[in-house]
C-alpha cells in the first residue's frame, strides 16, 4: 500500500508564461507518471496573505521564495510529490512512494528541495512549515531575507541527527537519498553524474538567483574547479 499519494504539486506564480524548459519538464512528468494527478499552485488557489513572508516575497517579485512556503503547505496538507518546474523525470517514481517522506542530497552536505515528497500530515513538514509563521521576507532594515529553503531544511534536519555525507539515511521519518537518485547535476559545474539509480534531473534553472551570482557561477563553470579554487586561494593570499 503506497503511503505517498500519486499527486504532483508544482508552483507557478507571477502570471508569466511557462519557459520552454518548464514545458519540457512537465511533459516528462506526463510521460512517465501518466496516472498521477498534477496540480499547479498559483495566485488563484493559494492565499498570499496566509503568511506575511509569502506576501512580502510576492510583492518583491521573488517568486521562488513564495514557493518555498507553498511547497511545504501543499505537501503537509495534501501529501504527494512536489517538483520544481526545472525537474525532468527520467523514469517512474513509484519506487519512492513507500516512504513516509523523502528527498535527497543536493551536494555532499546539503538537502535538495527541487523534489520532495511526503504523506499528508507528516510531522516534520508541519515543523518546517510552521517555521514561516513568524518569519518576514523583508527585514526591519528593509533588506531581503534571501535564506534559501535548502539552508533552512538542512539546518532543521541537523537538529535531528542529519549526517551531511551524501549517504542514504532517515532523519525523523524523512528519508534522504544520495545525489544520484534525484539530483545528479552538480549545482556549481552543471556536470551530470547519471547512474542506474537516477530517477530525475534537477536542471537548476536558478531563476531566483541575482545576476551577479549567475555570472559568478558561469565563470566558475568556464574555469573549472581547480582554477576556481586556485583563484580563491590567490585572492585570500593577496588580502593578507
What are these regions (language model features)?
Residues 69-80:
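Small-residue hinge/turn detector
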Residues 1-67, 83-240:
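Glycosyltransferase-associated regions of secretory-pathway enzymes
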Amino acid at each position: 500500500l503506497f503511503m505517498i499519494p500519486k499527486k504532483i504539486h508544482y508552483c507557478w506564480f507571477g502570471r508569466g508564461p511557462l519557459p520552454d524548459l518548464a514545458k519540457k519538464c512537465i511533459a516528462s512528468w506526463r510521460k512517465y507518471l501518466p496516472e498521477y494527478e498534477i496540480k499547479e499552485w498559483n495566485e488563484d488557489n493559494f492565499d498570499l496573505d496566509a503568511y506575511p513572508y509569502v506576501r512580502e516575497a510576492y510583492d518583491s517579485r521573488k517568486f521562488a521564495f513564495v514557493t518555498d512556503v507553498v511547497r511545504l503547505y501543499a505537501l503537509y496538507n495534501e501529501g504527494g510529490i512536489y517538483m520544481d518546474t526545472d525537474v525532468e523525470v527520467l523514469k517512474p517514481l513509484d519506487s519512492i512512494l513507500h516512504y513516509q517522506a523523502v528527498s535527497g542530497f543536493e551536494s555532499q552536505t546539503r538537502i535538495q528541495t527541487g523534489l520532495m515528497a511526503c504523506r499528508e500530515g507528516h510531522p516534520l513538514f508541519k515543523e518546517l512549515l510552521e517555521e514561516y509563521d513568524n518569519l518576514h521576507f523583508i527585514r526591519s532594515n528593509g533588506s531581503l531575507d534571501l535564506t534559501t529553503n535548502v539552508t533552512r531544511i538542512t539546518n532543521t534536519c541537523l537538529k535531528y541527527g542529519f549526517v551531511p555525507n551524501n549517504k542514504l539515511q532517515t532523519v525523523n521519518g524523512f528519508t534522504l537519498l544520495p545525489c544520484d537518485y534525484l539530483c545528479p547535476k552538480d549545482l556549481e559545474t552543471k556536470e551530470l553524474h547519471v547512474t542506474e539509480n537516477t530517477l530525475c534531473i534537477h536542471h537548476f534553472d536558478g531563476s531566483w538567483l541575482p545576476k551577479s551570482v549567475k555570472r559568478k557561477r558561469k565563470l566558475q563553470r568556464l574555469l573549472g574547479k581547480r582554477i576556481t579554487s586556485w583563484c580563491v586561494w590567490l585572492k585570500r593570499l593577496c588580502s593578507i
